Amino acid sequence: MCIRDSYKDAPLYIPPYEYYNKEISAWAKSMGIQVVNFTPGTASNADYTTPDMKNYRSSKSIYDQIMALEKKEGLNGHLMLIHFGTHDDRTDKFYNGYMEKMIKTLKRKGYTFTPLREAVGFW
């Protein structure tokens, strides 16, 4: 079996640390994989940080940033990266409360949530 054939069920790729360049993009394309990344501005990707880090963002500050951005320019089409596995030192896991609050708030505002494959047109 060719490696390329095994990617049919996972055609989307978020590179480690969300870092990629032309070489990574070309590699992915040659394998039939689409590189995707989060939309900057919401700070949702900072949910991995721990209190000892210089760039630490609490779950409340992440939630507040998302809501502030929504109020300022809307979130239609935004891709948010939320980590479902974070270090034990991060005791305020975004997914243990603020994620549900965010989803409910955005649904009340008329937003819908779309599977990633559909959102990026990769069905």
Question: Predicted regions span which residues?
Answer:
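Catalytic domains of cell-wall/extracellular-matrix polysaccharide-remodeling enzymes
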Residues: R4-L81, G85-K107, Y111-T112, R117-G121
